[in-house]
Amino acid sequence: MRIVFDIGGSVLVPDEPDVKFIEEIAYQLTKISEDHEVAVVVGGGRVAREYIQAAKSFTPNETFKDYIGIHITRANAMLLIAALREKAYPFVVSDFRKAWEVMQLKKIPIMGGTHPGHTTDAVAALLAEYLQADLLVVITNVDGVYDSDPKKNPNAKKLDRISTEKLVEIAMQSESKAGGSGVVDALAAKFIQRGEIKTLIIGKDDARTLFDAIKGKHKGTLVEP
């Protein structure tokens, strides 16, 4: 299979870099890459949102704030590159064609953000579409898709399997400005729907056994066209 992994920045760097988890995810990705083609997109997470929030004190320019977030995603991506050692391409990849070329070298391309207005979820969905990936795996700090925000509604119900259309409907409720933090943002959900991309959305616990998760052993949400 050809698989794109979308790893949330808050998963890798909750308050500070989670070195143990980064080592675990690097091991899992290395193991998976032995039998599958792998590409990775890394998000900015809480750190990016804090910088973007601080920048609001100085500028209303959303594009400028997006660039701040992009730089932080790439710093997080470099951490994962370091953990993957020789298995990863040694530089952060910034375009899809380069990601494809790196995969032909049997290396794992690691991307961060690319363009203002696109979250890393959207980048991952577009990369999956470009590469004609068999599966997009979204690793977030929530263990799947819920019918409402589980942080605000204790009775929120997790959805084990949904359509891409339903994902778009749920994602439309999330924040679309720089630093938005929905499980999957609306633009990414629309790209997933357009590309008819089979998508698995899982939390940090499932990510620790990522090799099993891609085989169906997970507690997350499977999104299908």
UniProtKB/Swiss-Prot annotation:
Binding site for ATP: 9-10, 45, 49, 140-141, 146, 149
Location in or out of the cell: Cytoplasm
Gene Ontology cellular component terms for the protein in this record: cytoplasm
Subunit comment: Homohexamer.
Family recorded in the similarity comment: Belongs to the UMP kinase family.
Function: Catalyzes the reversible phosphorylation of UMP to UDP.
Transmembrane segments: none
Keywords: ATP-binding, Cytoplasm, Kinase, Nucleotide-binding, Pyrimidine biosynthesis, Transferase
Main location: cytoplasm
InterPro entries in the cross-refs: AceGlu_kinase-like_sf, Asp/Glu/Uridylate_kinase, Uridylate_kinase, Uridylate_kinase_arch/spir
Catalytic activity: UMP + ATP = UDP + ADP
Pathways per UniProt: Pyrimidine metabolism; CTP biosynthesis via de novo pathway; UDP from UMP (UMPK route): step 1/1
Highest taxon in the source lineage: Archaea
Tagged with keyword Kinase: yes
Activity control, per UniProt: Inhibited by UTP.
Protein's UniProt name: Uridylate kinase
Sample GO molecular function, one term: ATP binding
Binding site for UMP: 44, 66, 114-120
Classification of source organism: Archaea, Methanobacteriati, Methanobacteriota, Thermococci, Thermococcales
Entry EC no(s): 2.7.4.22
One BP annotation, GO: 'de novo' CTP biosynthetic process
